[in-house]
Swiss-Prot record:
Name the UniProt record assigns to this protein: Protein C'
Organism: Sendai virus (strain 6/94) (SeV)
Origin: domain of life: Viruses
InterPro entries, per the entry: Paramyxo_C (IPR002608)
Record comment regarding domains: The disordered region at the N-terminus is involved in C protein self-degradation in trans. This self-degradation of C protein may play a role in the regulation of viral RNA synthesis. The disordered region at the N-terminus is also involved in the host STAT1 degradation in order to counteract the host innate antiviral response.
GO cellular component: host cell cytoplasm
GO annotation terms (biological process): symbiont-mediated suppression of host innate immune response; symbiont-mediated suppression of host JAK-STAT cascade via inhibition of STAT1 activity; symbiont-mediated suppression of host JAK-STAT cascade via inhibition of STAT2 activity; symbiont-mediated suppression of host type I interferon-mediated signaling pathway
Family: Belongs to the respirovirus protein C family.
Lineage, opening ranks: Viruses, Riboviria, Orthornavirae, Negarnaviricota, Haploviricotina
Additional observations: The C protein is found in virion at a ratio of approximately 40 molecules per virion, presumably associated with the nucleocapsid.
Length: 215
């Protein structure tokens, strides 16, 4: 049958062949346009459903049915309450981090006097020389190398600032006593085992602050 069709096609006049070809192309174009039309309609429908879903997801409790609104409102209130509570927690952390500010008035005065001497007097020069020699003599670490390679004035300032930080770490609370220092040392001991430079600085800070704690 296929051979008969082929024979008929060969015998067909050329103008009829052109007509049939044009008709075939027209049918293909119509079929393609219908497919595109169906796709565009489907896309519009999907967009509409997505838009409706988004609007439904952003519905406020006031537009929901009463039973659903009752379920959502406690969650909203809990979230607002946690947001109000958070600054208070942050404030507590800041109070702990502002080391030295919680010391008794007498200890606080002695602490600030000591820190001032470190930055402005011969005590500070003696401190940085002692720290430099101890760090130079210790086992080499990345931190010790970093400090030893600093320019002298920058190194002195860094060592003084690190000492001040340890002083404020050790001297805090209503009144710092020896047992308080022991507890704080135990807290930072694991850190000091890894940071030998900090251990050296902490020991010198404690040596300077011992008279304040024993006061």
């Amino acid at each position: 049958m296929a051979s008969a069709t082929l024979t008929a096609w060969i015998k067909m006049p050329s103008f009829l062949k052109k007509i049939l070809k044009l008709r075939g192309r027209r049918q293909e174009d119509e079929s393609r346009s219908r497919t595109l039309s169906d796709s565009s309609m489907l896309s519009c429908r999907v967009n509409q459903l997505t838009s409706e879903g988004t609007e439904a997801g952003s519905t406020t409790p006031s537009t929901l049915p009463k039973d659903q609104a009752l379920l959502i409102e406690p969650k909203v209130r809990a979230k607002e309450k946690s947001q109000h509570r958070r600054p208070k927690i942050i404030d507590q952390v800041r109070r702990v981090e502002s080391l030295g500010e919680q010391a008794s008035q007498r200890q606080k005065h002695m602490l600030e006097t000591l820190i001032n001497k470190i930055y402005t007097g011969p005590l500070g020069e003696e401190l940085v020389q002692t720290l430099y020699l101890r760090i130079w003599a210790m086992e080499e670490t990345p931190e010790s190398l970093k400090i030893l390679q600093m320019r002298e004035d920058i190194r002195d300032q860094v060592l003084k600032m690190k000492t001040e930080r340890w002083l404020r770490t050790l001297i805090r609370g209503e009144k710092t006593k020896l047992k308080d220092f022991q507890k704080r040392y135990e807290e930072v001991h694991p850190y000091l085992m890894k940071e030998k430079v900090e251990q050296v600085i902490m020991e010198e800070a404690w040596s300077l602050a011992a008279h304040i704690v024993q006061e």
